[in-house]
Amino acid sequence: MEITWYGQSCFRLTERGSASVVTDPFDHKVAGYGALKLKSDIVTISHNAPGHNFVNGVKGYKHLLDGPGEYEVGGVFITGVRTNGKNQTGQLRNTLYVFDYDGITIAHLGDLREVPSRSQVDAL
């Protein structure tokens, strides 16, 4: 398992024989990091903001996950759970993702604003 951090909330997860994942790709003009030039099978977006949803920084992806649900892609089981955190219009705005790579489990919290509730943790 290889986990690479690119800045902000953007990581790439790779495991031999499984789909690769990029989380929360950022627009470098907003985030203040170098421009992303990544390749991945899956992109996850925790919420709709330029620092977390710049899919133009990722090439080759076939699956874009931008909300809660259960997914299975390329040997990776992914669970997305809506968590608390409100945007300027008062809407729920963050999805926490849990990735299971054949026994290796990783959580990406996105732009989590507070500790998840018991029911949110149970949903994982």
Segments predicted by a language model, with ranges:
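Terminal membrane-proximal soluble interaction domains of membrane-associated proteins
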Residues: F54-V55
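Core dinuclear metal-dependent hydrolase active-site scaffold
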Residues: M1-I42, A49-G51, Y61-A123
